[in-house]
Amino acid sequence: MNAIPYFDDSLAPFWPSYQSKVIGVLERALREQSCSRVRRILLRLPWEHDNAFNSRQTWFGMDFIETVSALMNAKPGRDLCWLLTRHPEKPEYHVVLCVRQEYFDGPELDRLILDAWSNVLGFASPGEAAPYQKQITRDVVLDSRSPDCEDILKDLIWAFSDFARDRRGVCDPEARCLAGNPGYPG
């Protein structure tokens, strides 16, 4: 059973610190961005999953987050909230980005994601990266002034339940990790 409410129990067992991280990132976006565009994306690597992928030192997902942050000229810890993990068996990343709605509409965020992933993969043009990224869910606007804000927050927690699964049995350190920037107080 689930110790923290709103997570999809069908995906249990959960790791409590990962549950806290999912909630922390969404609460931070709500607190610091006033009106946040939340998007879940899938980023694929254009080569096969092999031993070279498992033993490499570069974590492409973190390179993507750093590149997105640089391209949007983000103020550290304020303009971008995110979650990131890698699939344990496939060369792909699952990412949640929360950006300020006032700065990024849907098409602008599309371009930002494509530019960043293209840059990380070393492609000459963003169009080359298009087959290797896709939006998994429609954008959700999380606005603290909205009367349905609490319901939207609960829906997002449920939708991102798979990020909080217990990964202790996963061998690859990158796939075992749930990275994010919840900005815990203290």
Regions found by a protein language model. Give the residues of each.
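Catalytic "initiation/cleavage/transfer" segments centered on a nucleophilic residue
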Residues: M1-C35, Q101-G186
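Signature for HUH/AEP ssDNA processing cores
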Residues: G24-H87
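Short, solvent-exposed polar/charged micro-motifs at secondary-structure junctions
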Residues: N51-A52, E92-Y93, R138-D139
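Short, well-structured alpha-helical interface segments that form or flank functional binding sites
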Residues: W59, D63, P88-H94, E108, ...
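Histidine-centered divalent-metal-coordination microenvironment in nucleic-acid enzymes
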Residues: L80-Y103
